Structures are given as structure tokens and as C-alpha cells.
Amino acid sequence: MNRILRLLLCTLLLPAMLTSCASAETRALFINVRKADAALIEVNGLRFLVDTGHKDSLEQLQQVLETYGVSRVDGIFITHTDKDHVGGLKKLLKSGFEADMLYAPALHSEKSNAKHPVYEASEKYGVPMTWLSSGDVIPAGEGAAFTVLGPLRKDPGKENNNSLVMHLVTPDGSLLLTGDMELPEEADLLAAGLIPRADVLKVPNHGEDDATGRQFALTVQPKWAIISTNTIDEPDTPDEKVLRNLTQARASIAVTQDADVGILVILDKGKLDVQAINWE
């Protein structure tokens, strides 16, 4: 843990953050939902959620969304069916939260599409759904889009390796979003030449030792790497080898557990600012 840059560029109280971010064109808040994933992304006035944490951390996610005044998003991406990524989805929609579209990877380990939790949520709450495959592009306003990189093949035994991997490119900068991708999916994407450089990396699989290989980190060369985890839930995260690989790639590192609300990334015309956001 001593390799992590704990003194981020700025630590703010939430109300001040809302004011200070008003001019930013692209921002991503990686929310502290313990050892789970949930990120709120805003680009060109459009808002997206990437994962919804687990049901036990839904209250924190809802509190953050309410504080932002976010009652609807243009899309919710669920990277895979692990409960710490999709667990909050159904209760979030049941609460009246609105989404224009739900997205999930077409390759998954559920017995059928009808058994997929995102499909079930789509049917129950009347939200349209799109299955995503490598090569698909989801526009996000002028000059911006999410490009789906993986998964390239179905891993029937390890749902993490069916994780939706996306590259968000905007005029302000880029983010690589990786779900819980482990080393086998990393290897597939590296072999296919699909791993891009990115300004910001959402570190795969909570910084565990079965992901973020050295070649992957050196290929992405992120300026900042964001790890979504909690050492109470998972004491071995972030793994020292993962931190070493990211450090060798010259990435600064932030961990969601080090902020009450989460880690805010602001991309603004090539400039990059990272802030730890706390409640009052």
C-alpha cells in the first residue's frame, strides 16, 4: 500500500466538488461501494453508469446519485454478472431510477439470455436492452464514443473473463474500463492488438493478483490508475505485484476506499485532474 499515491491532487468536500466540476466536459466518479464497482460517467452532457455495485452497497450508490441530482442516465453498462457489479441494478430500477438503455456483454456464463440478470431487469422494469460484442460502438455525443474491445470469446468457467471491456474516447481524453477482466482475457486482447493507450485505467478485478499483468500495464501506460476495492472485504487488495506493474508503467494510483464518496477524474481538453471526494 505504500506504493499508492495517497495524497491525491485535491481532497474536497462534496458540495464544493459539484461547483468546481461545472466546467469539466468529461468526468468519471469511481464510487466507493466497498469491494465492488460503480462509476458515474458524464460526457457531452450525457450520463452513464458502469456497474451498480452489490445490493449491500446500494444505499451508498443511491446517496451519491441523489446528491448529484441524478435520477436518470442515458445508459447503464453491466460488465458481467458477478453480484458486486450487477447486484444493485434491480433495486436501483425498482426505486424509480430511470435509464434509457441497459447494456451487457453478449458472451456470458448464464444458462441462457433469459436468465441473465440484466435481461431480467429489462423485462421487469421495461427498460430497453442491448447485447454488446467486440467492435460495437456506443456514441456519447460529439467526438466521443465507447468502443467495445472484449470479451472476444466466452469463458464458461470464469465469468470475470467475460467482462465487458470498453475504451471511452473523448476530445478531452480517454478511459479504459475493464470490469473484472483477468489475465486470460487480457492475453486475448493483447494478442489481438486491441489494448489501447489510455489516460485513465479502471484497474481490472479490484487490483487482485490475477489481473493487470506487466505487459498489459505497459501497453496501456495510464497516467492514472483507479482501483475499486476495500481491504476490509478483501485484505489482499490492491496486490503488491499489481501496484508494481502500474508503477513501472509510470501510473499514479488512487483507491476508492481512500475517499468517502469516491475518486473523481476530470478530463478537460487534454488536462487531467484527480480528486478524492469526501462527505462533509
Indicate residue ranges for each PLM-predicted region:
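Non-globular, low-confidence helical/coil segments that flank catalytic cores
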Residues: 2-4, 21-280
